[in-house]
């Protein structure tokens, strides 16, 4: 196979042997599309592309589980935006599903034939089913931290009704680090990774709060981190495969449910720890830092009908080649 990687920011990509990087909607992008046999995306299909006979369109989707409402099920979705669903999704040959709840709810939300759903689990999550010391080393080398340094990943999600430029009171992240360092006798850092739709900046003077967006691969950060703090980001599904603690900001969950899209699965049934707000994080993080939630998460995966087994890439390749 000839592999083409499409991005809006080719200058940020690490060059790898056998992979050509092109800018989205550039002349090279359209030329290469004309001769590609398989087009893979993690969202909608670019409306500027005209599908040729014999081409395969596949989406891996960008969120695991089936937490946030999508498609026609959304509460405040723009009607013009919603009118484009058919144009974006009806051309799909395959939709990769992480769990039975995803198949059931997304088929209805996007009016898709259930036959196109590949119930394989998510390719990006295969890494959580085996040991990858090289991933940890990559992250540690990038941020110049030692093997003993612990990582708290702070990864808030996108909310349409939130201010265009949102700030969190990062004093509580600093306090959390102080408390964790005192309790564990280890050094800690925070990687602050904002959603790419939202301009959130790290204006902390604390040198232990680092730019999580500077690193190119979110799954590497999830694999390497010891704790995850978020609001309603679907990365909770991915991180739960590690069995490590997930902390949710409950005030943001309530806002999203009442003012934005809402949830397919009520958030009070999720197995993750809930902080009233970011001010409650220091106490919660210290209390639950060493807990193993594997059993609790396993029950949740069973309820959702998880397809995650660590073999998604292998299964999808077999389907595409046959």
Residue map of PLM features:
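Short active-site oxyanion
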Residues: 1-3, 90-95, 188-190, 224-227, ...
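Conserved catalytic-core segment of nucleotide-activated headgroup transferases in glycan assembly
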Residues: 123-203, 275, 312-314
């Amino acid at each position: 196979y000839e592999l083409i990687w499409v991005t809006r920011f080719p200058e940020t990509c690490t060059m790898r042997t056998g992979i050509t990087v092109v800018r989205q909607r550039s002349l090279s992008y359209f030329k290469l599309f004309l001769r590609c046999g398989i087009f893979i995306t993690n969202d909608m299909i670019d409306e500027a592309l005209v599908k040729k006979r014999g081409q395969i369109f596949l989406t891996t989707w960008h969120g695991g589980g089936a937490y946030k409402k999508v498609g026609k099920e959304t509460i405040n979705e723009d009607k013009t935006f919603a009118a484009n669903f058919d144009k974006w999704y009806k051309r799909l040959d395959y939709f990769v599903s992480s769990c039975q709840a995803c198949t059931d709810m997304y088929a209805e939300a996007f009016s898709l034939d259930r036959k196109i759903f590949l119930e394989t689990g998510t390719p990006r999550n295969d890494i959580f089913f085996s040991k990858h010391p090289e991933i940890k080393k990559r992250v540690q080398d990038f941020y110049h931290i030692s093997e003993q340094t612990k990582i708290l990943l702070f990864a808030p999600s996108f909310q349409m009704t939130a201010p265009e430029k949102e700030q969190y009171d990062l004093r509580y992240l600093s306090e959390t680090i102080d408390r964790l360092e005192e309790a564990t006798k280890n050094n800690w850092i925070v990687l602050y990774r904002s959603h790419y739709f939202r301009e959130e900046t790290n204006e902390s003077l604390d040198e232990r709060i680092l730019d999580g967006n500077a690193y190119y691969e979110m799954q590497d950060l999830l694999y390497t981190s010891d704790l995850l703090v978020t609001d309603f980001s679907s990365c909770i599904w991915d991180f739960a495969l590690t069995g490590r603690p997930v902390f949710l900001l409950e005030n943001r969950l309530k806002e999203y449910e009442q003012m934005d899209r809402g949830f397919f699965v009520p958030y009070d049934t999720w197995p993750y720890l809930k902080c009233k707000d970011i001010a409650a994080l220091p106490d919660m993080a210290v209390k639950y830092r060493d807990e193993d939630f594997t059993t609790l998460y396993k029950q949740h995966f069973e309820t959702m009908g998880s397809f995650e087994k660590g073999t998604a890439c292998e299964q999808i390749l077999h389907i595409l080649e046959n």
